[in-house]
Design a protein with these regions (language model features):
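A solvent-exposed interaction/effector surface
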Residues: 2-196
Length: 196
């Protein structure tokens, strides 16, 4: 009887190890380890509004004539295909303009110097200079409603910051895979600003 219990415990422990390993594997597949990728700039904490400087960089950009929230899957697919085809390392975050719909992916420093990138499907390479944004950090699902609510909040917040003025339209910043569980997702809304 004691031998039977030991055998059951051993089998149970093995099952537990399998479940943990399976979860870790699924976590990797669905973006739970997204923060392991190289980040183009620091994340704004959830619920925080701040002004931050984004570095100059080289981007891959996909564009659409329609609004982003109608076209986002097509934009992500085109960018992902370009990343895979050119064997470019993944980075975070991905930025998305709303009207017209755009999605941009930051190239890592080594890939930014490459001259052999093959870009198709309307994906283009673009250089950006250092810029300043007002940012609000968000935790939760990626939706048009979340974007609109937080765009309103960051517009109201920047009015309380002496000397700072908006110089562009708000856009959304995604830190995690679209497949990540909604309540773990992190994002931001940025509003380009200038002091003067």
């Amino acid at each position: 009887m004691a031998d039977q219990r030991k055998s059951d415990v051993a089998r149970g422990g093995g099952s537990l190890k399998f479940v943990i390993l399976a979860f870790v594997g699924v976590g990797g597949l669905f973006g739970l380890n997204a923060m392991a990728y190289e980040a183009a700039y620091p994340m704004t904490a959830a619920g925080v509004c701040e002004i931050k400087t984004l570095p100059a960089g080289v981007l891959l950009e996909a564009r659409s004539e329609g609004e982003y929230f109608r076209e986002n899957n097509g934009l992500f697919r085109r960018l992902f295909e370009a990343i895979q085809k050119n064997q470019v390392p993944m980075t975070t975050p991905v930025e998305a303009g709303v009207r017209p719909g755009t999605m941009v992916f930051y190239l890592d420093p080594t890939s930014a110097k490459r001259t052999d990138l093959v870009l198709q499907g309307g994906v283009r390479r673009r250089e950006v200079e250092e810029r300043v944004v007002a940012s609000i950090g968000i935790r939760g699902g990626y939706s048009k409603e979340s974007f609109e609510e937080n765009a309103r909040k960051i517009r109201e917040w920047i009015k309380t910051q002496p000397g700072w003025k908006p110089v562009g339209e708000p856009y959304v910043v995604y830190w995690n895979s679209p497949f990540m569980i909604w309540f773990l997702k992190r994002s931001e809304v940025h509003l380009p600003v200038h002091k003067g």
